[in-house]
Amino acid sequence: MNKIYLPASKMQDLETIIKESWELKVRLNQLSLDERKIIVLSGDHGVGKDVWAKLMKTKNPEIEIIRFADPLREAFEKAGIPGHSIDSLKRTCFKFSEFKVDGYQLDGMTMREALVHVAESNKVKFGQDYYAKQAIERAQKALEYSKLIVFTDMRFLVENKAVQDFAKANNLYIVRINIPEGLPKIEVLQD
């Protein structure tokens, strides 16, 4: 897949982005809900996998977006840090002071360090497939009302295996799309 180039002045309007990006328009129009399938979005950190998923969902609202990190983000939200703050704080040097998530002390850690610490601690405590199992449970429930499930953050072999096993058990076809660098950040779609 080629890089997507859009004029900076038009990066805020979803309809304009879809209209002006031939490649994006073609990809979105190729989404067929005739058969049940899984789309796995891959790409470097920060290239816009979640943005692509949201664009797909805008085009086809029946799509279910699942992130392996959702339970981790929900744990931080329960502790008082909303999702949009998580993303903002990851880009800063902010460090926690007297803060706990899921019982883990995060003093002196940046947001990224805290996310990794809680995730890895939970994997040690509950098994390496802790987050994969939760994502697959959500995907199984989503099959009751959706033919297309999009995973946006597959990072580990255990997650890949879980998705493959899930697809095989449910007779689903897996499509992998690599998101190129250069997809603009669309603030309208950010959490």
Label every model-predicted segment.
Residues 52:
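Hydrophobic positions on the alpha1 helix immediately C-terminal to the Walker A/P-loop
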Residues 64, 134-187:
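ATP-dependent NMP and nucleoside kinases share a basic, alpha-helical "lid"
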Residues 75-77, 182-191:
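Short, charged, surface-exposed secondary-structure boundary motifs
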Residues 49:
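Conserved lysine of the Walker
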Residues 70-146:
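ATP-dependent small-molecule kinase phosphotransfer cores
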Residues 2-39:
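Extreme N-terminal, non-catalytic leader segments
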Residues 58-65:
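Post-Walker A helix-loop "phosphate-sensing" segment adjacent to the P-loop in P-loop NTPases
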Residues 43-44:
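P-loop (Walker A) phosphate-binding loop of NTP-binding proteins
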